[in-house]
Amino acid sequence: MPSPFMIDDLGDRIATVWSELRPATRGLVERALQAAATGTQTSRSFQYDARADLELSRFLAALDDRAAEKTAALDAETGGKLKSVADTCASVLQEQTESAEVFAQLVRRAEMQKDYKRIDTLADALTSRFPPSEICELARSEDVIVRELANEALARCPISVLAALLNDPVDAETARYALRRQVVEYGSEEARRLLAALDQEEM
């Protein structure tokens, strides 16, 4: 569990961001760190919300920025603490987030660390937990890996989900691309018929 001394030890910006977290969010991180240290499961009693998502995302960004500095003040012990807190924070976000922006942050982080197992885990979370509109947003990302993970997830979506997205002026073209992939890669006749009907309507 991070004591105030430990957090202060990690740098001024980290201490500031930590102090700005709601007590409930700080408690979530503390319990996750304790669970990681003891090998136990964390409690699910905390009501995770969009604000906790944003707070943890900012905290993780501060931790990763500090780790990237590699200054003389960052000795081996402090670096180890920094990595432990950052990895724990990333794990909590990975388990809880449904935000496209946070997902992209986690993928970029795993990519920089060459942690391909974590990227696979994130891809699984994308298909099992994220709303279709968030996946579409990721499919338009400038990050190649994020974009490909999202397009792959959409290509495995049920036709009914993609059909609903066709009514959204922002997501419609992304949904069409997913339907085309279903035709080409999976030989989906249902997707083929839907695309043909769309083409007929537009003639």
Where do the model's predicted regions map?
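C-terminal end-of-chain micro-motif
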Residues: 1-2, 202-203
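Alpha-helical repeat scaffolds
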Residues: 106, 192-195
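Fungi-biased detector of serine/threonine-rich
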Residues: 64-65
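Structural detector for internal amphipathic alpha-helices that build alpha-solenoid repeat scaffolds
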Residues: 16-20, 31-34, 41-61, 73-98, ...
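N-terminal "cap/leader" segments of large eukaryotic alpha-helical scaffolds
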Residues: 2-35
